[in-house]
Amino acid sequence: MKKILSALLLIFAMLLSACGGVKYELKDGLMYDADGKEATGTFEFKTGKYKVKGNFVNGLPDGLFEEYYEDGSIMAKETFVNGEMTSKELFYKNGNLLGNFTENDDIKLYYDDGSLILSYDAEKEESTYYHENGNPLMIGNSYETTLYNENNEVISKLRDDDLTDIGATLKKLDDGTFELVKGNEVIAKIDANDEIINYLYSTGEPLLKVNESTGETEFFFKNGNTFMKGKEGGSILNYRDGKPLYEIDGDSETIYNEEGDKIVGGFDLVTDIKKLD
């Protein structure tokens, strides 16, 4: 009887081992073992539907963490030092860089072909958005914002929230609307009520629509799709086909790849924790 009981206990122990044995919990960014102690080692787990692998030291993330798309390609690489994230890189499924975030809060976002979408210099507190051809579209900081057409020509400049002289002339048309002309080029059209201004590409397509009465702004690609649009409490930046890329909603930020997959990052909705060593 004792031999049978011992054999059953051995089988039960083997089953426990096969089922994972020690259970771990990731809570508030810290990894704990079954006894509630801060764990050390390399772990693999899921955040939503994506797999993550990385190292913890005394419960804190430390070193390189990699997050994977469902097909196994790299989605994100995050580097931690003693629990603090020092850098983050995001990737398209083909391996090209989507975004780069540094410890000092510098940001760069890229199209799939490697061209820049936007960059943020934290030291200067300056944001730069780019045309599809790589020229700057808008450069803005705490005191000045400059708008450019695709040929790198200034078509609007604000300094301390006031429009500055860029050498353009306002021309009133027979229908009561206005055109803003710089040289021989129409750079903007304004409605008769002086409420809506449409800045233009050099070839005449809408570039930026500003509604003075509502405060709404909307930037456009040359193909007519929305590039960027402000909304209450935030803004949304799109790919060339109009699908969302980067969305800000209050204090929340979301980044999507070109297929619409949400780039998760961080340690939210963690399941299936496994210790690898």
What are these regions (language model features)?
Residues 1-4:
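Positively charged n-region of N-terminal signal peptides that target proteins for export
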Residues 7-8, 234:
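Composition-driven detection of intrinsically disordered, low-complexity segments
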Residues 8-15:
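Bacterial N-terminal signal peptides
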Residues 17-277:
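Glycine/tyrosine- and acidic-biased, solvent-exposed loop/turn segments at the edges of beta-strands
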